[in-house]
Amino acid sequence: MDNNENMEKEMMVKLLAKKEQVDMDLRLIADRLSTVFKIEESGEILFSDFSSLDDDQKMLALLTGKFFAARWGLINSERMRITDIAKALARPRQTLSTRIVSLGKKGLVSRDTTDGRYYIDKNRLKDIVQQITKVM
């Protein structure tokens, strides 16, 4: 092998995500989130201690739960309209609208420009879990 091939192989080893490591990361994330919510087979998110979470944590937890529910095929889409988020959390839509825009500015939540639905940025999943599980 020449130097270029060795360099390419080294870069590949550093950047190529191994399924086992990704799965292990997701297992650790699931362990942390299991103290906050559970997911019914219908895809509904059931909070363990709803009153201990602020609105940002509730929205992030709900959207993260929907991410996993969609990943496992329990629901068709992880994306939610703000009215559906407000209904699921029993909070005023206007209150949550301001908060979700703030989460978007932090890069934790994205909004689909075609239909206005919100979803978590899965590349920030570790940051999102840290935000959800931080002590108030």
Model regions and ranges:
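Long, low-complexity, charged/polar intrinsically disordered regions in eukaryotic proteins
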Residues: 1-51
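Short helix-coil-helix linker/hinge
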Residues: 52-56
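Minor-groove-contacting beta-hairpin "wing" of winged helix-turn-helix DNA-binding domains
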Residues: 79, 115-121
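A short, conserved structural fragment
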Residues: 104-114
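Short amphipathic alpha-helical interaction segments
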Residues: 89-105
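Short, amphipathic alpha-helical interaction segments positioned at domain boundaries
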Residues: 125-136
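A short alpha-helical element within helix-turn-helix/winged-helix DNA-binding domains
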Residues: 77-87
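Short helix->loop/beta-hairpin flanking segments within DNA-binding domains
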Residues: 58-78
